């Protein structure tokens, strides 16, 4: 019998692409870089925040000082706006409810910085109690590395 299921967050339980794109574009624009269409971000996501920003910056990411500025501006914007357009995918709340009814524990492991994970889950799934939910922490490598598990 399955005792626990651990889900990814972005692109699995929730569609967060628009908020990610808007926040990265905010950082790009503030630093004189070209904003990218939201659609492009489908190819930028995966492997965590730093890779997301590097991919959006293109070759400009090699300027360490500029990269750190874009990242800081992104972080500041995303902290306020991470739930503006983000929503759970259809059927996820019901799936989580069915798992809970069967006694299956649920968890979330995300490459998103840890400080955003709980906030987003509480808005999207206010009636579900996750056994464990965590995001990227400095002491662990990002997924697909299994370190955080």
Model features per residue range: what roles?
Residues 84-87, 113-149:
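Substrate-recognition "cap/lid" segment bordering the active-site pocket of phosphatases
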Residues 2-94, 101-102, 113-115:
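N-terminal helical cap/lid subdomain that shapes the substrate entry/recognition surface
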Residues 103-107:
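Short active-site oxyanion
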Residues 92-96, 148-149:
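Generic hydrophobic alpha-helical segments
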């Amino acid at each position: 019998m399955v005792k626990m299921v651990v889900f990814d967050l972005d692109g699995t339980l929730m569609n967060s692409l628009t908020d990610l794109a808007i926040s990265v574009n905010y950082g790009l624009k503030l630093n004189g870089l070209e904003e990218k269409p939201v659609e492009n971000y489908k190819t930028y996501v995966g492997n965590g925040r730093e890779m997301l920003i590097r991919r959006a910056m293109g070759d400009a990411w090699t300027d360490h000082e500029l990269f750190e500025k874009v990242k800081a501006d992104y972080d500041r914007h995303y902290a306020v706006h991470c739930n503006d357009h983000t929503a759970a995918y259809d059927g996820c709340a019901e799936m989580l409810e069915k798992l809970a009814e069967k006694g299956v524990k649920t968890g979330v492991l995300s490459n998103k910085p840890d400080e955003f994970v709980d906030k987003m889950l509480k808005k999207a799934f206010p009636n579900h109690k996750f056994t464990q939910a965590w995001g990227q922490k400095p002491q662990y490598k990002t997924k697909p590395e299994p370190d955080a598990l």
